[in-house]
């Protein structure tokens, strides 16, 4: 038997709390609307949904996923704004964890078959990189040895919702369509103005145009802080990927995460976010954010 350090294997980076996508689709009504649009079903009772979203488990980045049970299916929906060919492996780790939780009281050593819900993996992409309208990502593409029929396969469907892509789907699910409009506005405006200004303009326009109006009016402060963080993080992740890999290996994951947190705090402070807003978005205490904010920014560039 192989010994596995579960605390190490399931190490979670809790720097990030959530995304706007999660905020919208953790609402059962919105999630059911999206499910119906994708499957062509016509369910009307949101209480049919049993949401099973893990608290950042397994993921080493944002909690971008929404998983739920309905009609004997376990559907995992994730939002992405950057290209990520590793999603099939992440989905495999995630579905394994969910199946483990769903069957915790079952006898997996017995003679009776234990039934499990059929999985579905969907990625909603709205990044700036050019991507096909629909793409299948396969776990087998990640194998170091490519030969014959893979013994273990997982397929995830990527749906591009940027611009005019998948227009019928966005028309069938108004919430998804309006989410795409809002994020497209931010992305377009960041080409000519500061990020915080771009977010404010996008929010004001969407409220006037009845795009996510009720949601943005009710959650404006949190949605604003989250939007600024998400789009800044998108650029930040690319920079970290290019410049920080070797350094992260040398100093270790824990120290690397600490430095990342410090840079995020200073960046968000420079964006005009308050201590409480940063603490909320980064899932840290206000005391910890104040401690970092009081430090000399120059010390964090070392």
Regions found by a protein language model. Give the residues of each.
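Elongated, amphipathic alpha-helical interaction scaffolds
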Residues: 1-302
